[in-house]
Structures are given as structure tokens and as C-alpha cells.
């Protein structure tokens, strides 16, 4: 009888964590002893963490988490509601798929920039998924997201109704650990169901009154994929707070800014009012999007406490 095994935390509720093992089994486990004590301090178990679990010698059906393996990455954001602190959304990711809708709800490119900066700040590669692509023309969709495409982000146009883009996106997700992130109502759960029908995730319609989706995912859940890899459906976020990044680091989270930073006249240039700023000169020359620059200024001001 196996007494211990390793696996990945795929869900957590009320101190009980569901662990998916390397053998493809699922067990419910809780933290005990040292780990339980440390969980009230700096150590926070998260969905996506790799753990070792052991069977209780007295109760064969009871499992305990005995070790949390070192993380390779994490997707973290500020605690919601104005509280100070970090909330780890998912651990050990390879990439983030930032999902926005072409319409219903209307996309907000500046909000998209915020999601992209969070991925960059966490050292994660990001892909943009423009869902509900059948609701607008390709020309309209391209214009809405032109700034981010020009910044070099891979962009996928998808539709669960026409099947557009699903196969190509599936190829980029299989055998990797990915998280779908984005605002409410953009169709993340429906998209995951279309990519991998066996997941059977709950979905909800978009409210015509507010043009915002109702939350259907109540916490991050990691789903094993049929041919290897995991995909996480994260809750729809109305409030996305930056965490783990200083104001002076925001510029480096814009890929199109990075080649310019060393060309500024002053080493401590903050790219707002200084003479000889290569970033501002690129904006004026049309080489950097004014909209993306606006996002930079707003996010930097937010971290400086000026927003």
C-alpha cells in the first residue's frame, strides 16, 4: 500500500486541498504539524503547488501534506478590497493567457495592459486571447488590440461558435501549465470547455444591464489536460491590484520600452518629464503607442500612491 506520493494541488476549500498525483489519482489532504503552523505566517499553500502527501497510519483514507516543493513561478496580485498583501492566484505556471472579448463586454485596452504588466512582473510569458471574435469584423478586432500586437504579444482570435482559432490555441496549451486570466464575462470557462470538452465548467450569461459578466469561477482551479499539462480557470476579476513590483520597475514590464531604457540621458529617468528620455521620444515619433504609454504613467502613479 502506497504510504506517500507527490502531486499538484488543483483546488483548495476550507483548509482541505485536492491533490492530483503523478499516477493520475486524486486525494483530499490537509496540512498538519509544522506546515499547518507555518501556513499562518509567510508560507501560503496555493493552487499549482507541488506537494508530497502521506497516508495517515491510523486512518487509511486520510492524507496529510508533508512537504511543499520549491516554486518555479507564481501569478500573484494584490489582495482585493484595498487590503495590503499578496494573493497567489496560481503557482508553477509556464504562461498566462489573458482573455478579453471582442465585444460583450466591450474591451478596455488599458485594463488589458494591467493584466499584461502583472504577468511581466511575475516573470511569466503572456498570450492575448481575443474571444468572441465572431461578434466583430477582423478589422475592428485588429484595431482594438493594435497597441498590444505592436508590442510583440502573441494574439489568438477565438470563437466557440465558429471554432475559429481553437485548434491553434489548444496546441499552445497542451503539455504546459497555463492560467486563463481576464475580466468577468469574456467567456473564459466557455473557452476552456470548447478547448477541452471533458472539463464541463460552469458558465453564465453576460448581463445586458451592466455589460459585465457574472462570476462563475469562485476560486482558481487547476485542471489536468488529456495529453499532459494543466490549465487554470481563475475568477473573473473586477479589481486587479499590482503586487511585487516597485514604481521604478514598471517600465521594464513594457516589452517595447525595454530596448529604450538604456538610451535615456539620465540613468534614473522615470520617463515622464525628463529631457532626453528615449521612451518619450519614441512616443512622439510614433514608434511607441501613446495608449500604452498612458497605461505606463497610470500604473506608475498608482504604485507611487498618486492615483
Curated annotation (Swiss-Prot):
GTP binds at residues 131-134, 182-190. It holds the Pfam family RsgA_GTPase. This is Small ribosomal subunit biogenesis GTPase RsgA. Binds 1 zinc ion per subunit. Residues 82-240 form the CP-type G domain. CDD domains: YjeQ_EngC. Keywords: Cytoplasm, GTP-binding, Hydrolase, Metal-binding, Nucleotide-binding, Ribosome biogenesis, RNA-binding, rRNA-binding, Zinc. Belongs to the TRAFAC class YlqF/YawG GTPase family. RsgA subfamily. GO terms for molecular function: GTP binding; GTPase activity; metal ion binding; rRNA binding. The gene is rsgA. One of its GO terms (cellular component) is cytoplasm. GO terms for biological process: ribosomal small subunit biogenesis. Disulfide bonds: none annotated. It is found in: Cytoplasm. Monomer. Associates with 30S ribosomal subunit, binds 16S rRNA. PROSITE patterns: ENGC_GTPASE, G_CP. The keyword Transferase does not apply. InterPro entries: G_CP_dom, NA-bd_OB-fold, P-loop_NTPase, Ribosome_biogen_GTPase_RsgA, RsgA_GTPase_dom. It is an enzyme of class 3 (hydrolase). Zn(2+) binds at residues 264, 269, 271, 277. It comes from Gemmatimonas aurantiaca (strain DSM 14586 / JCM 11422 / NBRC 100505 / T-27). One of several proteins that assist in the late maturation steps of the functional core of the 30S ribosomal subunit. Helps release RbfA from mature subunits. May play a role in the assembly of ribosomal proteins into the subunit. Circularly permuted GTPase that catalyzes slow GTP hydrolysis, GTPase activity is stimulated by the 30S ribosomal subunit. Its cofactor is Zn(2+). Its EC number is 3.6.1.-.
